[in-house]
A protein has these predicted regions:
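Periplasmic-binding protein-like
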Residues: 1-8, 28-30, 69-74, 124-134, ...
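Short alpha-helical
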Residues: 11-14, 52, 79, 135-136
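Ligand-binding "clamshell"
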Residues: 23, 39-44
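Beta-alpha junction/loop-to-helix N-cap segments that form part of ligand/metal-binding clefts
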Residues: 1-36, 105-107, 111-113, 138
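Short, conserved catalytic or adaptor-binding loops enriched in Gly and charged residues
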Residues: 35-38, 93
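An alpha-beta-alpha
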Residues: 43-106, 126-127
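Extracellular/periplasmic bilobed ligand-binding domains
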Residues: 20-23, 84-145
Length: 145
């Protein structure tokens, strides 16, 4: 039996899933959380899926009354970020959380977040939700005032 243990993130997991299916190879991802990761019957994941993470984050914010006005900054070119954002937005409505801005960036435009941050500020955001990786998150935090 051939086995692929990996990939670590969603985008490469989705990219190789059809190849492992064609090769009749068992694929296990420890942290590929996009729903598309397990679209083929040969692929399994160990972690929570993006829908679970987005829903749980909105529930936590709502149940603990952390904010009623939330801005979202996400990477629309990444299945992980987009998947979490979609489910967070849906559950936020159920929790009575107003999304005051939902601003995207892409992998080729991920250095200057002044526009997204200004829209969050103008919308009166009490919390900014960042379903993204640490590189961009650190830039956003450094640019926020």
């Amino acid at each position: 039996m051939n086995v692929l243990v990996g990939t670590v993130t969603s985008t490469p997991c989705v990219a190789v899933a059809n190849e492992t299916a064609a090769d009749n190879m068992f694929q296990l991802t420890p942290s590929g959380s996009a729903t598309e990761c397990v679209a083929n019957p040969n692929v399994f994941r160990v972690c929570f899926s993006d829908p679970n993470q987005g829903t749980a984050a909105a529930q936590y914010i709502g149940e603990h009354k952390l904010a009623t006005k939330v801005a979202i900054i996400y990477d629309s070119s990444d299945v992980y970020s987009s998947g979490i954002t979609q489910n967070f937005t849906a559950e936020a409505a159920n929790q009575g959380i107003e999304i005051v801005s939902s601003e995207a960036f892409t992998a080729d435009n991920n250095k200057d977040f002044s526009v997204q941050l200004q829209k969050a500020k103008d919308g009166g955001a009490e919390l900014v939700f960042l379903p993204i990786y640490y590189t961009e998150a650190s830039l956003i935090l450094a640019q926020a005032d």
